[in-house]
Amino acid sequence: MKFFMVFVVTFCLAVCFVSQSLAIPADAANDAHFVDGVQALKEIEPELHGRYKRATCDLLSGTGINHSACAAHCLLRGNRGGYCNGKGVCVCRN
């Protein structure tokens, strides 16, 4: 059994080394599309992230812990607590 495991591990390592040694370098045609450094940062489009104020109250309202989750959220922000108003928005107290 030990011999079999040693053989399998050795075989896997050999396959990895052979696959790396057979890798073909990229040709110059692919280098034209590669963007590096500061230019790459300028060309990257920013991702759109939504900040949903109602996530704490609306998503957790079905579990019955909506006000507790809102209060915990406000405590983590450094406020004295909070509550969910009628529109489902977490309102933190000062």
Swiss-Prot record:
PROSITE patterns: INVERT_DEFENSINS
Locations listed in the record: Secreted
Chief subcellular location: secreted
UniProt-listed CDD domains: DEFL_defensin-like
Domain of life (superkingdom): Eukaryota
Keywords recorded for this protein, A-Z: Antibiotic, Antimicrobial, Cleavage on pair of basic residues, Defensin, Disulfide bond, Immunity, Innate immunity, Secreted, Signal
Any one GO cellular component localisation term in the record: extracellular space
Disulphide bond pairs: C57-C84, C70-C90, C74-C92
Statement: the UniProt record of this protein carries the keyword Secreted: yes
Signal sequence bounds: 1-23
Propeptide positions: 24-54
Function text: Responsible for the anti Gram-positive activity of immune hemolymph of P.terraenovae.
Name this polypeptide is given: Phormicin
Taxonomic source organism: Protophormia terraenovae (Northern blowfly)
